């Protein structure tokens, strides 16, 4: 834990003033185990003030609330339309919790917050216009029980105290803001964000099978991502998120991290794909690869498909050679993913939040 935190702070100190140009060195060490938080009770709010949704996000552009300040028998309604500073405050709270709560994989909840935002968005289907980040329907079964979403309760629970402190923000906007914050605080590129997502009930749950299956190859990847409206270059750029986090045998069945610095976003994922020698892992789990040198890293069949397919591989090579290009393309495509199917108000603007600990 201490080594992981020290390495992260060292990387932060070595940053240049131009964020996209950063090429972070791999961490010397990262925490292999530790207590994992899988569930927690939502924080309870108190006091005499009542927050109630009265105006939808579309009506006010960035959302709106009636704030009922009860004083005895009287109640004075006020319209609250959150602005940039309000969302920056939410961002700051998430960043603060990321710094304080180090009882998760490799000392950070950052990667699992990115995964939550990704999986909430990656259910979009352009033909039917269903799915996507608008709704936060993973709060409900059956979507919460989909195999691809195993372990994401930890991320949802991590954000519950933030929701309690800022009850005006929708879960849909909060989950995406959590992903944006995590990427930026893990030394990634700036990720423009705009609010306007509205929560839905269980009727909006998407069918199982819309998220990528890591055991599959390039044809499956194209079927999944083309359905959302992505091209080959965007598929490879989005895959760069695998620089973060690790797989768990009790969730996906796979096990291990992709990179030596799983809480720092760099282009190391692409470099390792090309530079390391990969072999099948001999174990009782599903088929996955391990690096021949240390046997401590893993790649999944869907990862290896990126260098087995010529059209994919050209982009792997470009991103491995140019971290700035990767950051630029990753930022563009993750914003596209996070906004799929969201009925934003006309002329709504994107914001870039100031980092707190990065």
Swiss-Prot record:
Alphabetic keyword roster: Heme, Iron, Metal-binding, Mitochondrion, Oxidoreductase, Peroxidase, Transit peptide
Top-rank lineage group of the source organism: Eukaryota
Active-site residues, record numbering mapped to chain: 119, 258
InterPro entries xrefs: Ccp1-like, Haem_peroxidase, Haem_peroxidase_sf, Peroxidase_I, Peroxidases_AS, Peroxidases_heam-ligand_BS
Region Disordered, residue ranges: 192-214
Residues spanning the signal sequence: none
Catalytic activity: 2 Fe(II)-[cytochrome c] + H2O2 + 2 H(+) = 2 Fe(III)-[cytochrome c] + 2 H2O
Site (Transition state stabilizer): 115
Cofactor or coenzyme needed: heme b
Gene Ontology terms describing biological process: cellular response to oxidative stress; hydrogen peroxide catabolic process; response to reactive oxygen species
Pfam families, sorted: peroxidase
Free-text cofactor note: Binds 1 heme b (iron(II)-protoporphyrin IX) group per subunit.
Gene3D superfamilies named among the record's database cross-references: 1.10.520.10, Peroxidase, domain 2 (1.10.420.10)
A single MF term (Gene Ontology): metal ion binding
GO CC terms: mitochondrial intermembrane space; mitochondrial matrix
The enzyme's E.C. designation: 1.11.1.5
Enzyme class: oxidoreductase
Residues involved in heme b binding: 242
Subcellular localization(s) per the UniProt record: Mitochondrion matrix; Mitochondrion intermembrane space
Subunit note: Forms a one-to-one complex with cytochrome c.
Family according to the record: Belongs to the peroxidase family. Cytochrome c peroxidase subfamily.
Protein name (Swiss-Prot/TrEMBL): Cytochrome c peroxidase, mitochondrial
Species this chain originates from: Neurospora crassa (strain ATCC 24698 / 74-OR23-1A / CBS 708.71 / DSM 1257 / FGSC 987)
């Amino acid at each position: 834990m201490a080594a992981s935190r020290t390495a992260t702070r060292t990387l932060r100190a070595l940053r240049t003033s131009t964020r996209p140009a950063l090429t972070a060195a791999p961490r010397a060490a990262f925490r292999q185990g530790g207590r994992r938080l899988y569930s927690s009770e939502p924080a309870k709010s108190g006091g005499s003030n009542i927050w109630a949704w009265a105006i939808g996000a579309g009506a006010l552009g960035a959302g709106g609330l009636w704030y009922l300040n009860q004083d005895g028998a009287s109640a004075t309604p006020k319209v609250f339309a959150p602005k940039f500073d309000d969302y920056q405050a939410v961002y700051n709270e998430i960043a603060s919790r990321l710094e304080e709560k180090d009882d998760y994989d490799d000392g950070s909840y950052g990667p699992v917050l990115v995964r939550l935002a990704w999986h909430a968005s990656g259910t979009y289907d352009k033909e039917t216009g269903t799915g996507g980040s608008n709704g936060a329907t993973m709060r409900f079964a059956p979507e919460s029980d989909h195999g691809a979403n195993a372990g994401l309760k930890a991320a949802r629970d991590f954000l519950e105290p933030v929701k309690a402190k800022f009850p005006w923000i929708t879960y849909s906007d909060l989950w995406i803001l959590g992903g944006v914050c995590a990427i930026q605080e893990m030394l990634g590129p700036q990720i423009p964000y705009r609010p306007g997502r509205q929560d839905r009930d269980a009727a909006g749950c998407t069918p199982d099978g819309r998220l990528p299956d890591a055991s599959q190859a390039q044809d499956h990847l194209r079927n999944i991502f083309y359905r959302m409206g992505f091209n080959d270059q965007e598929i490879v750029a989005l895959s760069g998120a695998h620089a973060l986090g690790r797989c768990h045998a009790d969730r996906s069945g796979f096990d291990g991290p992709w990179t030596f610095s799983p809480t720092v976003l760099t282009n190391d994922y692409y470099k390792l794909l090309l530079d390391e020698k990969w072999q099948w892992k001999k174990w009782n789990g599903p088929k996955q690869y391990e690096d021949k040198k240390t046997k401590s890293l893993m790649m999944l069949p869907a990862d290896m498909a990126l260098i087995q397919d010529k059209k994919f591989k050209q982009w792997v090579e470009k991103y491995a050679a140019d971290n700035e290009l990767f950051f630029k393309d990753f930022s563009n495509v993750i914003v596209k993913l996070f906004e799929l199917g969201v009925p934003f108000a006309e002329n709504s603007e994107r914001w870039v939040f100031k980092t707190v600990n990065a």
